């Protein structure tokens, strides 16, 4: 196992890997909108660099459902273009699209905004397939050798943001466009978006203590 980051990535050029997992792409949609050139470099050009300079049997590319549902945005376009590079590189490669996630390390995003009763700059009727990041990590570990192609993994269902706000009695207001982040896959996973409520309960408890 090798941990590759900004300070050592050049060290592993031509190194022979069995599997390379690329989770280096930016995940900030609003940042991408304000910094389109930087997002292109960090998403498309960086993926191209790894594909051209690293030796591997299989490349696992961690992408986003935005490549499907936000094709007209900078973020979505760049994610889609990076996927095309991976697909054309090797038919054994695996592209994993993720949706909204939650976990102990979460510090920003719509869930944190609602916990703190801040304005959420998305339409409240937006549907999100929230998924526990631990489940995602375990799925990748268990399936990285036998899966290939393009898969969206995550919760089998979704929750409207306004429903979460009302459930936790947040005072958040919603401003913005409809932004559905739903997992679409032939296989329906057992994990449910409703697990997010346990996470929110814990966060709210921490806030009051």
Predicted regions and their residues:
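A short beta-strand-loop structural module common to alpha/beta enzyme folds
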Residues: 1-13, 174-177
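Active-site beta-alpha turn of Rossmann-fold NAD(P)-dependent dehydrogenases/reductases
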Residues: 24, 60-64, 97-99, 154
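Amphipathic terminal alpha-helices
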Residues: 191-209
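NAD(P)-dependent short-chain dehydrogenase/reductase
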Residues: 84-135
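NAD(P)H-binding glycine-rich loop region in Rossmannoid oxidoreductase-like domains
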Residues: 9-46, 53, 64-69
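Conserved Rossmann-fold NAD(P)-dependent oxidoreductase catalytic core, especially the SDR/UDP-sugar
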Residues: 48-76, 94
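Mid/C-terminal beta-alpha module of Rossmann-like enzyme folds, strongest
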Residues: 139, 143-188, 192
């Amino acid at each position: 196992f090798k941990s590759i980051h900004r300070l050592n990535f050049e060290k592993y050029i031509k190194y022979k890997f069995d599997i390379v997992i690329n989770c280096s792409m930016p995940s900030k949609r609003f940042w991408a909108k304000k910094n389109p050139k930087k997002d292109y470099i960090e998403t498309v050009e960086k993926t191209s660099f790894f594909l051209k300079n690293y030796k591997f049997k299989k490349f696992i590319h961690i992408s986003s459902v935005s490549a499907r549902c936000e094709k007209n945005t900078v973020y979505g376009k760049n994610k889609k273009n990076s996927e095309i590079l991976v697909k054309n590189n090797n038919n054994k490669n695996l592209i994993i699209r993720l949706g909204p996630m939650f976990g102990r390390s979460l510090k920003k995003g719509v869930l944190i905004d609602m916990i703190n009763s801040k304005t959420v700059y998305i339409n409240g009727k937006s549907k999100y397939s929230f998924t526990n990041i631990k489940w995602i990590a375990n799925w990748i570990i268990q399936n990285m050798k036998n899966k290939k192609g393009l898969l969206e993994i995550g919760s089998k269902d979704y929750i409207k943001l306004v429903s979460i706000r009302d459930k936790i009695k947040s005072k958040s207001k919603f401003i913005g466009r409809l932004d559905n982040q739903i997992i679409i896959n032939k296989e329906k996973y057992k994990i449910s978006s409703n697990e997010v409520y346990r996470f929110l309960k814990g966060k709210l408890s921490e806030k009051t203590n």
